[in-house]
Amino acid sequence: MHEGDEVTTKEIKSYGNKMRLQEARDSANRLLGFRMRSVFEMKRRLKEKDFDQEEIDHTIQNLINKNLLNDEEFGRAFVKEKVRNKKIGPRALKKEIYQHNLADELTESLIQEVYDEFNPKALIESHLTKKRIKKKTIITEKDKKRLTDFLIRKGFYWDSIRDVYYDWELI
């Protein structure tokens, strides 16, 4: 295009579409600059920015082709980060990952994989240590209930909690 050229309405529309696609790609890349995202989350965020479905689909496919958007890699990084930093149990992790709308089989395999690496009993023990509970310490029923409720809120199953209590001779 040069100065003085006449531009048709069709060409203007074509340039407008190309600009919108570029804006969608730029927006997606900015979002990925902060942290990894799931496909579902990226679609939602682009929709919030008023991009139409065609622009969103094109941008998502472009990111997937460039391997910048990958649910499995996102899920693996997400579950590791949550368990490593928050030391949460399987139930809480499942609740947190549910928001990202990953496939059920993928979610289950990621949870299994992360708890093969981070033993739930070791995580419970780290919470007990942080709460300054020592092995073979006698604690009141009230304190035991508070501790149990805390661990259940952290997403651990009663069976794991009970096993640690027996190992530490708290029961």
Language model features by range: what are they?
Residues 1-171:
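An alpha-helical, amphipathic repeat domain used for nucleic-acid recognition
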